[in-house]
Amino acid sequence: MSKIVLEAKDVYKHFTDGKSTVEVIKGLSLKIAAGEFVSIVGASGSGKSTLLHILGGLDQPTQGQVFLNEQRFDNLGEAERGFKRNQYLGFVYQFHHLLPEFSALENVAMPLMLRADTNYKEVKQQAEHLLDRVGLSHRLTHKPGELSGGERQRVALARALVARPAVMLADEPTGNLDRKTAFGIFELLSDLKQEFNMAMLIVTHDEQLAQSADSILHMQDGLWVDHS
């Protein structure tokens, strides 16, 4: 049986606005094994992005537990959670969040360049390899403003992979792309998941795109729902 690399146990998330409390996540549990590709599908406001932020250590649950690589993750201090994120997780968002003043190569290399033990030559080679893998070997020196939307998202994918994460978390990674480009990105994600033997969790509102995953979870009003 494959190792469980990401797990949520009975997770709740409440937000308080003045005297009122809004329940966004209502007791969700989830297990993702190494090499598994899971899609979470739900409409806007269903709580799927909030759950992804909790699983990625960007937010903390009101109640419940999160485990990363079989170790408790949600109760760590902010600095230690940040260290674990950089060590085990890769993130891709609907908006690419590339730094506009840096080239594609520099953007991809950035996560490793920030580490104390950086070997600059090796980092550059690794970034070049990943850009080649996502079909952008001819765009190494181009800045984000010189790339198409699909190309920018491919750079973001390469950047998320450069640290060889155990888990890739993607929040509506094709939300800003046309249909053909979106399917191409999902196909690439599936291929990269196999190549790097990493777990992948993607949230999307698009049922058709989600079919690429090994399993699909449907979310509504902060709960899993049966969609059979």
From Swiss-Prot:
It comes from the Bacteria. Transmembrane segments: none annotated. GO terms for molecular function: ATP binding; ATP hydrolysis activity. Gene3D superfamilies: P-loop containing nucleotide triphosphate hydrolases. Keywords: ATP-binding, Cell inner membrane, Cell membrane, Membrane, Nucleotide-binding, Translocase, Transport. This is Lipoprotein-releasing system ATP-binding protein LolD. The keyword Amino-acid biosynthesis does not apply. Its main location: membrane. GO terms for cellular component: plasma membrane. Belongs to the ABC transporter superfamily. Lipoprotein translocase (TC 3.A.1.125) family. Residues 6-225 form the ABC transporter domain. Disulfide bonds: none annotated. It is found in: Cell inner membrane. Part of the ABC transporter complex LolCDE involved in the translocation of mature outer membrane-directed lipoproteins, from the inner membrane to the periplasmic chaperone, LolA. Responsible for the formation of the LolA-lipoprotein complex in an ATP-dependent manner. It is a peripheral membrane protein. It comes from Acinetobacter baylyi (strain ATCC 33305 / BD413 / ADP1). Pfam families: ABC_tran. The keyword Nucleotide-binding applies. The complex is composed of two ATP-binding proteins (LolD) and two transmembrane proteins (LolC and LolE). It is an enzyme of class 7 (translocase). ATP binds at residues 42-49. Its EC number is 7.6.2.-. PROSITE patterns: ABC_TRANSPORTER_1 (PS00211), ABC_TRANSPORTER_2 (PS50893), LOLD (PS51244).
